[in-house]
Amino acid sequence: MVYLKNFLELGISETFNHTLRENGITEATPIQEKAIPVILSGKDIIGQAKTGTGKTLAFVLPILEKIDPECSDVQALIVAPTRELALQITTEIKKMLVQREDINVLAIYGGQDVAQQLRKLKGNTHIVVATPGRLLDHIRRETIDLSNLSTIVLDEADQMLYFGFLYDIEDILDETPGSKQTMLFSATMPKDIKKLAKRYMDEPQMIQVQSEEVTVDTIEQRVIETTDRAKPDALRFVMDRDQPFLAVIFCRTKVRASKLYDNLKGLGYNCAELHGDIPQAKRERVMKSFREAKIQYLIATDVAARGLDVDGVTHVFNYDIPEDVESYIHRIGRTGRAGGSGLAITFVAAKDEKHLEEIEKTLGAPIQREIIEQPKIKRVDENGKPVPKPAPKKSGQNRQRDSREGSRSDSRRDSRNSSRSDSRNSSRNSSRNENNRSFNKPSNKKGSTKQGQQRRGR
């Protein structure tokens, strides 16, 4: 894809251009090219763009250009549906502030120390990036002052609607000045999002990035046809074969993600899980380790991976196929970032064909199939050493032989017992003690041993 303009032409100052070049960014993406001039003009905008189009910088750069560092009030508010996305946006802003230490940004979200948040909010904070719940909590406590707010961004608005944050967003907007600039970014435009825009935005300019402008050309896509039962073995086979540098493994639910994590961790894979049941502090540690390549495999749900943007992800594994095309595009977009190449492999069972057909129809081409025939999986213990195979059970022939041998033993034993009885009857006048020592006792021991052997044999 060829981008026509650099950031200087779009109105971004040399200070931020220098920082962009230091980060390897020299040309604007379509959403950046279209949105930045409009945002700099102060107009409200609705940006319809999918993940991976560069929309974060599309609103971050003009916001930074308009911040007055001499004013200590909160001037820009960015609302995101998840903690992970809020942290991702905050990280992007901090990257741009290397040469502008006079501008301060603060992320506030659930799971943090409230007292620490209060101390920072009382300081010199120009930009706040927040999740709806914690932000509304601060508004109701009157611990955040939005009276001088000039800009608000609702990022991934459709996801906030999906998570049930619509009323929270309305309450937040009601607490902001009417003269502010409002920006709304969303991959899709449900009716409730349109109603929200109509109520709270002032003649917004619509900016769209058409689907053909969102490219997955640098991502190789494959489908592996399997069954639910064989899927774990198929996944491990591909992991061992491809040896990814960093990989994200997507599961449909938290339960399935946790189960797969236990399975892979028990087999010695360097992996971690990321989903809603993981405490926030641990989630942040996991993401930090993954970004630093200390964790090779990240097993995640769609919700937890929202906004996940990590350099060096070479593989995406759709352990469970996503149920809609938007989620598929978002998932595979975790690899092939910044123009790099990547590989996305989707494991498909017979029941998943309907979802696969929908994805292929949207992409406009079939995805390459790959068949794995009975992968050989090595079983290892907790130390990585091979576990020996259990001894095979006896065949039917062996059991029949044991049965015949048992019958013969029983027959011989009965014959000996009969002979012994006759001998005792014919020699009652003889010394019984001697007979018992010489005949009966050894025979009883021998018979008992034989019976024990036969029981064990059977």
Curated annotation (Swiss-Prot):
Q: Name one GO biological process term.
A: response to cold
Residues covered by the Helicase ATP-binding domain:
36-207
The consequence of inactivating this gene is:
Wild-type growth rate at 10 and 30 degrees Celsius, no change upon exposure to H(2)O(2) or diamide.
User: What does the record say about induction?
Assistant: Induced at 10 degrees Celsius.
Record domain Helicase C-terminal: where: 218-379
Q: Where is the composition biased (Basic residues)?
A: 443-458
- Span of the annotated motif Q motif: 5-33
Region feature Disordered, mapped onto this chain: 374-458
Q: Which reaction does it catalyse?
A: ATP + H2O = ADP + phosphate + H(+)
Which intervals carry biased composition (Low complexity)?
A: 426-438
Residues reported to bind ATP: 49-56
In what ranges is there compositional bias, type Basic and acidic residues? 374-384, 399-425
Motif DEAD box at which residues? 155-158
Query: What's the Enzyme Commission number for this chain?
Result: 3.6.4.13
Gene Ontology molecular function: any one: RNA helicase activity
Known function: DEAD-box RNA helicase. Probably has an RNA-dependent ATPase activity and a 3' to 5' RNA helicase activity that uses the energy of ATP hydrolysis to destabilize and unwind short RNA duplexes.
| PANTHER family, per database record | ATP-DEPENDENT RNA HELICASE DEAD (PTHR47963:SF8), DEAD-BOX ATP-DEPENDENT RNA HELICASE 47, MITOCHONDRIAL (PTHR47963)
Instruction: Return the protein name.
Output: DEAD-box ATP-dependent RNA helicase CshE
Q: Which organism is it from?
A: Bacillus cereus (strain ATCC 14579 / DSM 31 / CCUG 7414 / JCM 2152 / NBRC 15305 / NCIMB 9373 / NCTC 2599 / NRRL B-3711)
